[in-house]
Amino acid sequence: MKYTEFEIISKYFKRNQKKDVNEIKGIGDDSALIKIPKNNILAISTDTLVEGTHFLKNISPEDLGYKTVAVNLSDLAAMGAEPKWTTLSITMPESNNIWLKKFSSSFFKILNKYNVRLIGGDTNRGSLSITLSMYGLLKKQIALLRSNANIGDLIYVTGTLGESAAGLFLLKKNIFIKNVNIRNYLIKKHLNPIPRVSEGMALRKIANAAIDLSDGLIADLDHILNDSQCGANINLNKIPISKVLIDNFQSQNYLNWALNVGEDYELCFTISKKNIDKLKIIKKKFLVNFTCIGYITPIEQGFNLFDNQKKIIFKKKGFNHFD
């Protein structure tokens, strides 16, 4: 049995989620109505995921439902915003009830984990693509902007880098690894990234600039440098690489994955040296590591990578939709 557009919305996407006090009208009308609390501003992020470009054709509906939400949460995390609401638009070749049930179940599972409510959306027929808009709140004057880095700031990243790219290459069979547990771990890092929402909210009062690492460290950090009109010195030996990658792959592979491939969805942020003691206190609250990889310099000095004090020549590349 195939459902109509409105039957799909009613059956799979109209859930009895915990209501938000600022939500006047949610899903089910021509538009949602939201009240913005006093002294707050609204952070808005939108991502479109297209089959064959952002996810492989054989991805499970459960993994796609999770990742659709996770990558948008990561954008809000980079601003220091608290995620509150979302809208979803799905274009798909046909009304597949089994697919919709699995997708929506995973989709709402991660929404509920982060206390986010679905307040609207749309369904259409066509090649599989998903567009999600995420809305979050934060107090005025404390957003983590890409343009706020200052000369002398230290540059930090959360977690480890390169594992998502390794998982992608395993899925595409560009590399092979015998250990099934390690293989599954890396693939999960690609399909089920952890958005650093709590970390972003904790950093918003002490960090200066931030970005989530979706396109690779070099490309994403370069956005901060361009917007802040600064340069940077990065030490390759300080980039956090997991023992899993070091033990199972060559260094040129995992460094390239960390620098250029992306989809780690960790946070890269800059912070003044005077706030390092505050950062140490924050670090104790989280299981994830915070690693200093370099510092911000005057724009005239450019963007530099060093390997044991030896300057490395590199190209500023990363994921680009139109390459």
UniProtKB/Swiss-Prot annotation:
Binding residue positions for Mg(2+) 3: 30, 75, 212
Keyword Transferase belongs to the record: yes
Annotated Mg(2+) 5 binding sites: 215
Gene Ontology biological process terms in this record: thiamine biosynthetic process; thiamine diphosphate biosynthetic process
Annotated metabolic or biological route of this protein: Cofactor biosynthesis; thiamine diphosphate biosynthesis; thiamine diphosphate from thiamine phosphate: step 1/1
Binding residues annotated for substrate, in chain numbering: 54, 263, 319
Enzyme Commission number(s) of this protein: 2.7.4.16
Binding site for Mg(2+) 2: 47, 75
Positions bound to ATP: 121-122, 146, 214
Residues that bind Mg(2+) 1: 46-47, 122
Uppermost EC category: transferase
Keyword Ion transport recorded: no
GO molecular function: ATP binding; magnesium ion binding; thiamine-phosphate kinase activity
InterPro entries given in the database record: PurM-like_C_dom, PurM-like_C_sf, PurM-like_N, PurM-like_N_sf, ThiL-like
Alphabetic keyword roster: ATP-binding, Kinase, Magnesium, Metal-binding, Nucleotide-binding, Thiamine biosynthesis, Transferase
Coiled-coil residue spans: none
Binding-site list for Mg(2+) 4: 30, 45, 75
SUPFAM superfamilies: PurM C-terminal domain-like, PurM N-terminal domain-like
Something else known: Reaction mechanism of ThiL seems to utilize a direct, inline transfer of the gamma-phosphate of ATP to TMP rather than a phosphorylated enzyme intermediate.
NCBIfam families per record: thiL
Protein family: Belongs to the thiamine-monophosphate kinase family.
Function: Catalyzes the ATP-dependent phosphorylation of thiamine-monophosphate (TMP) to form thiamine-pyrophosphate (TPP), the active form of vitamin B1.
Protein's UniProt name: Thiamine-monophosphate kinase
Organism of provenance: Buchnera aphidicola subsp. Acyrthosiphon pisum (strain APS)
